[in-house]
Amino acid sequence: MKVTLVGNGRMGQQVAEVISRSNDHEIAAVLDVDARITPEIFHGSDVIIDFTVRQAFMDNLPAMLASGVPVVVGTTGWDDAMEEVRRMVADARASLMYSANFSLGVNIFLRTLREAARLIAPFGQFDIALEEQHHTGKADFPSGTALRAAELVLEANGRKRTIVRQLSDNRKLAAEELQVASVRLGSVFGKHTAFIDSDADEILVAHTAKSRAGFAGGAVHAAEWLAGMHCEKPGFYTMDDFLNERLS
């Protein structure tokens, strides 16, 4: 599989390292975040992997979709444009897979959290809150993974209806509000924790990344899967689609 990497930051470099150790894949090109991108750049590639920033991703997306090459997107911070991106993918009859976090461990954590949120829903004595920790160089907060975790809690629980990213000094948190706290600390790769609390006990559902290798390896697995799906059924995919097929 020939891969073009868009973005040469920490994650792009980690993905390149994973690919360099593989006998089955190779890097076709590495494009800097500021590169002028046209559809022709991607000709000869089997898949594109994008780890850039919101503005670069949105600017480059039309050219990536027009290339006809399936696109794996790890760039976060564009959730408010999700419907627009889905429409662009459909209009181009393209294949795009997005995840705020491609780590298999994180996605297993998210599934576990969704089930825990569902199980506590009938029992009003349980409250739930989320916390994410990342290195001080991470610009967006809460993290894309934390926001996805919050969405899953809202979908599965029913008692929580809105997400609160920052607490105010002059009001209490309402019972239907789900707090998502963010910590930026040192060189933390990523830690996500769900706190489920009652008067009698506390349940923790957590995932801690030990390195970026899990994120990068998951992105390459996703690229392999998407390249195969592109031939069968173009569309907008997530890690849920990937896991559902692997578990079926």
Curated annotation (Swiss-Prot):
InterPro entries: DapB_C (IPR022663), DapB_N (IPR000846), DHDPR_bac (IPR023940), NAD(P)-bd_dom_sf (IPR036291). The active site is at residues 134, 138. It catalyses: (S)-2,3,4,5-tetrahydrodipicolinate + NAD(+) + H2O = (2S,4S)-4-hydroxy-2,3,4,5-tetrahydrodipicolinate + NADH + H(+); (S)-2,3,4,5-tetrahydrodipicolinate + NADP(+) + H2O = (2S,4S)-4-hydroxy-2,3,4,5-tetrahydrodipicolinate + NADPH + H(+). Its EC number is 1.17.1.8. One of its GO terms (cellular component) is cytosol. It comes from the Bacteria. Signal peptide: none annotated. Disulfide bonds: none annotated. Catalyzes the conversion of 4-hydroxy-tetrahydrodipicolinate (HTPA) to tetrahydrodipicolinate. HAMAP family: DapB (MF_00102). This is 4-hydroxy-tetrahydrodipicolinate reductase. It comes from Chlorobium phaeobacteroides (strain DSM 266 / SMG 266 / 2430).
